[in-house]
């Protein structure tokens, strides 16, 4: 009985060691501090992440519902990008996507529960990238927050 348990243990250990692992990053490389929204899956996708200092954030990407859906491309539409530091602040904006290009960034919003936002700026940096730049002040300390959405390989890559 001990031999059988030993063999089963060895076999399961080997299966973990030799099993090939496929990572999403193999298809394309991701920048640090990024999450990937699968446009084909659609809907609302939420990610609980931490920055380099271990501070928690919630990143949410939502597909806006449209009354007239165009049959030509499921990738066309409006997507809301949100970054939130729970109990401290929340920032969001929307991007319009058409023919795998960001045609417009709009509806920027920033709410501070603690501290305040000194400045905010929403820009379409290129046909495939939009960034929301924010400067936040808390107890005389200023910090920069960037929330970038980039179209890549049929996905929206959000860098926080």
What does each of the following model-derived ranges do?
Residues 1-84:
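N-terminal prepro-regions of secreted/extracellular proteins
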Residues 64-160:
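Mature secreted bioactive peptide module from preproproteins
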């Amino acid at each position: 009985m001990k031999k059988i348990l030993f063999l089963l243990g060895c076999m399961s250990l080997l299966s973990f060691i030799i099993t090939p692992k496929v990572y999403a990053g193999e298809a394309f490389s991701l920048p640090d501090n990024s999450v990937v929204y699968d446009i084909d899956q659609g809907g609302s996708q939420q990610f609980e992440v931490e920055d380099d200092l271990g501070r928690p954030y919630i990143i949410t990407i939502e597909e806006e519902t449209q009354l007239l859906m165009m049959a030509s491309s499921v990738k066309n539409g409006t997507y809301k990008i949100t970054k939130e530091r729970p109990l401290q602040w929340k920032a969001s904006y929307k991007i319009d996507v058409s023919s795998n290009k960001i045609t417009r960034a709009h509806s920027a919003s920033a709410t501070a529960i603690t501290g305040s936002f000194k400045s905010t700026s929403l820009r379409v940096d290129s046909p495939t990238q939009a960034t929301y730049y924010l400067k936040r002040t808390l107890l005389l300390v200023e910090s920069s927050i960037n929330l970038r959405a980039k179209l890549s390989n049929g996905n929206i890559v959000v860098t926080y």
